């Protein structure tokens, strides 16, 4: 069995989709004001004095707490449709080639899974989330050709709480989540693709690792 595990932001895309999604969903003015408000926290994060996942949680909560999940999902789908140009052609070629060979493809991303999944509609025949998201019938739950492992959002009474329902899928959490889906490590060949510090553990786990691929 062959598994190809792709990081999303920076590996398959040319930009960080959290930043782009907030700008798309909230508008440039609200985006700039929100990040200005959190500037001290972001500086501390860059200096490794404040945890990445906490900064991400606070920023996400600032922009999306209280939004209906239906509206959020619609924004996710529309964002992906409007931003397919962010996907690197070489990454798409590698992903399609793996699928066409019958290999298993997994996207392992720190980004919110609800906006990652729609980027791949029309690229893979069937797409699933490791969290079994209640998306439309265009994302069947059986015989996945492509699975998305990402950070999931928490909801209450149909609205975003501003918190995440899973750990931030970053660093060692990427390995933990991948092995939870495919625990029999000795029985498959793993090829991994990543571009940042958050992918180190995933790349170290792989039989074959590609660091910062698809740049040419």
Annotated model-derived regions:
Residues 1-48:
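Active-site neighborhood of HAD-like aspartate-dependent phosphohydrolases
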Residues 65-74:
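Acidic catalytic patch
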Residues 2, 28-31, 47-49, 70, ...:
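Conserved alpha/beta cores of soluble small-molecule-handling proteins
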Residues 12-15, 50, 66, 172-175:
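Electropositive phosphate-/nucleotide-binding environments in soluble metabolic enzymes
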Residues 20-21, 55-59, 75:
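A general alpha-helix detector
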Residues 74-75, 81-135, 139-216:
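C-terminal cap/substrate-recognition subdomain and adjoining C-terminal extension
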Residues 43-48, 55-64:
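Helix-loop "lid/cap" segments that line or gate small-molecule binding pockets
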Residues 24, 28, 78-83:
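Alpha-helix C-capping/helix-to-loop hinge sites
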